[in-house]
Amino acid sequence: MRSGFLRSARRLWARRAISRMPPPSEELLARGGPLRAFLERRVGSEAGGLDAGSPQLAAAARLLNEKERELRDTESLLHDENEDLKKLAESEIALCQKEIAELKHRIISLLVPSEDMDGSDLILEVTAGVGGQEAMLFTSEMFDMYQQYAAFKRWHFETLEYFPSELGGLRHASASIGGPEAYRHMKFEGGVHRVQRVPKTERQGRIHTSTMTVAILPQPTEIKLVINPKDLRIDTKRASGAGGQHVNTTDSAVRIVHLPTGIISECQQERSQLKNRELAMKKLRARLYSMRLEEETAKRYSARKIQVGTKGRSEKIRTYNFPQNRVTDHRINKSLHDLESFMQGDCLLDDLIQSLKDYSDYESLVEMISRKD
């Protein structure tokens, strides 16, 4: 019963995505719809008392009923013979419909349970996958895109690791990103990203397919995660690679091993050993916290199409097709046709992330309803 309801809800979303109509969450909230029935059970019917435990939700539900009643009354004036009155009614109807849409959006935001980590900062990790040098070049472009997106959102972006390839690409990199709701926006970026294009070195014009992987790790506070110093082994060594004279003269690189789990965190980005130790600990804390959340997250998202956590990291989530100037997110069947602008990491990326958030909210609502039925 529940799985069938979820499948039906996904087909509804898919049809809306193809037709570019508004998200169906509002349709679920229509009078007589399943979400409306759930809402009335949650806050109480008009005849009964409203739930004092949800005052904001109760107030919004009451106002929605009033506005819908006002809309029905105003629509009846459209049949009046007085043209001035009909024009006034049309204006009032447009305003009323706008207010109803805003109220539904407000109710949905109050109904959808917030995740504990949504307000957290995060660790971004990018790693080249299949495709050799082309995969490394794409990984570098993706890292730049996320750095530009952080600037667009006015978040703090700090590079923790950066391992370039010999020909200008990027093997692996990580960064700390902090700002209002940073994790809430970025959490669905984790997974396998596929690029299709003709490499600059390709003489016959053949399209190559390469991949890279993005991991998004919520960054815990000191209160949420306590690490026993006895569980850590901290080693220092000389940094390798580019970096100036300090590479061969200073033991600035830091390697931290969490003995109970075997998780390793390294950093040699900075000249200061203390700074590298701080950054390595930041990454270690994020990985331990992410591992702790995996079991809970897997249960919570087991029935969802959009995955968060390790399961999501192995899933191909998006294709960047340069010959077609198209980026497609496979989870919500949405395509955008301005790839160059998308890679700038501003409005188009933000729009796609908002669509993913909308779909996630939609699945949350559908699951909420199906559990109650």
UniProtKB/Swiss-Prot annotation:
Methylation of glutamine in the GGQ triplet by HEMK1 is conserved from bacteria to mammals. Its main location: mitochondrion. A motif (GGQ) lies at residues 243-245. This is Peptide chain release factor 1-like, mitochondrial. Keywords: Coiled coil, Methylation, Mitochondrion, Protein biosynthesis, Transit peptide. InterPro entries: PCRF, Pep_chain_release_fac_I, Pep_chain_release_fac_I_sf, Prokaryotic/Mito_RF. Belongs to the prokaryotic/mitochondrial release factor family. SMART domains: PCRF. It holds the Pfam family RF-1. Transmembrane segments: none annotated. Residues 229-293 are annotated as: GGQ domain. The GGQ domain interacts with the peptidyltransferase center (PTC) of the large ribosomal subunit to trigger nascent chain hydrolysis. Mitochondrial peptide chain release factor that directs the termination of translation in response to the peptide chain termination codons UAA and UAG. GO terms for cellular component: mitochondrion. The modification N5-methylglutamine is found at residue 245. Residues 1-13 form a transit peptide. One of its GO terms (biological process) is mitochondrial translational termination. It comes from Rattus norvegicus (Rat). PROSITE patterns: RF_PROK_I (PS00745). It is found in: Mitochondrion. The gene is Mtrf1l. Residues 56-111 form a coiled coil. The keyword Phosphoprotein does not apply.
